Amino acid sequence: MASQQAFEQSLMDEAYLRENEVGILFGNDSSAKPVIEAARIMDEKHDSALLGSGLIFQSMNSTVTMNLSTIFHLRGINFTVSAACASGSHSIGMTYLLIRQGLQDAVLCGGAQEVNYYSMATFDALAAFSVRMDEPTKASRP
C-alpha cells in the first residue's frame, strides 16, 4: 500500500512505470520465522521435500524487492540492502547516490522488517526493550 501511495504522490502512473526503467532498493535485515520453521521441520521429519518450493522465497531478504518489482513491473535496478536497524536509511542513501550519479532516473526505496515472536524475542534477549513502559514520558533516555 505504501509503495502504491508513493507512486501516486510522485505522479508515476502505470504508463510511466511501463515506459521507464524505475528501480527498487529496499532495506531489510532478517527473516527469522521461515528459517526457524524450516529447521523445525528438518529436525522432526528429516525430509526437505516437506519444506515446499515456496519457503525459500519467504526466507530471503530480497523477497520484498522481488515481490514489489513484480507487482509494479519495475525494470530498473533491483536489490536489497542489509545493515541491521539502519537498512531502510541505507537504502535511501544508496538511492540518492544512484540518482545523483545518473544511474537511475527514479527508484522506489524504503525499508521493511518482519515482525514476529521470534524476531522480537531476540531483541528482548538483548534487553533492547524498556521495562518501564508505564512511564512514556521517560521513553527517550540515555
Model region roles, listed by residue range:
Residues 20-28:
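Acidic helix-start/capping segments at beta-turn-to-alpha-helix junctions
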Residues 8-18, 30-142:
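Acyl-thioester C-C bond-transforming condensing/cleaving domain
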Residues 1:
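Glycine-rich anion/phosphate-binding loops
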